[in-house]
Amino acid sequence: MSMSWTRKGRIFDPAAHDWARSHAQVPTPLLYDDKVRIFYADRFEDGRSYTTFVDLDRKDLGKVIYEHKAPILGFGAPGTFDDDGVMPSFALRRDGQVWLYYSGWNRGVTVPYRNSVGIAVSDDDGTTFRRLYEGPVLERCPEEPYIAVTPTILRERDPDGRDLWRMWYISGLRWTLVEGKYEPVYVIKYCHSADGVTWARPNHLCIPQSHDNEAFSHPTVVRHRGQYLMWYCCRDSADYRDGAGAYRIGFASSPDGLDWTRQDDVLGLDVSGEGWESTMTSYPSVIEIDGRVVMFYNGNGFGRTGFGYAILEDQRD
């Protein structure tokens, strides 16, 4: 298999807007008739992430037509799983509502933070949100004791015709000490649900690490030409903050969404020689828009330089 992506450039740079803060991290698309809404995470001065959005012209994805200048969801109550940060991950429509699966953040003591998955619901087509529950729908568990976060979801049918929600998410393996600081190591796992809320977790590893300190983040999965295609980002546990071990976008394919063949070398979308994506490519989100396969993604600094997009021009099996 080979792929040919055309970079279309940066869409949104938070540094160019006086109301924005420091980041436009984890671009998360939702389609409308005439626009594409991109939820993303900015950060307050104290480093806590919050979620807001911009709207893009559906016919010209490089054109921002609306900028939302406030958080769409506040922090959780003290002691809850998201009292220190709210970061988008996947948006979908359900029963006249918009559901936003998001990553909640707690600051840690022995390690820097803990992450879990929550659901926020919008009754006004994706402008304001409320929590479906005060607690997480995906959390640490006996077999996965560290992190469960950044889901992507496909809604399908099981062999009996019943609803089947399929999720790919990040699961922590451990925290490893690097130059006196604990860094998280995590992989991509799979779970499923009948209702999108309660998840059966078979502890199924999707992609083995290439080395013990490799960490994955933000899988995005689509069905295309009879296959499941997954993009993600991966990094080392050392020197990964825009250094030699920084995030790069990777790729894998699967016949069933469970067992994956890693094919990073066919992706055809590495860092550029200079500019906003010169040291890092990260947090891909792939979606089909009007017959085109489009990837929204971050560049340097985990979204500090904003987000852009690329279009898949050719895929050969």
Region roles according to the model:
Residues 1-84, 92-150, 154-214, 223-277, ...:
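Beta-rich carbohydrate-recognition and catalytic domains
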Residues 217-218:
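Alpha-helical scaffolding within the catalytic cores
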Residues 285:
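Conserved active-site neighborhood of enzyme catalytic/cofactor-binding cores
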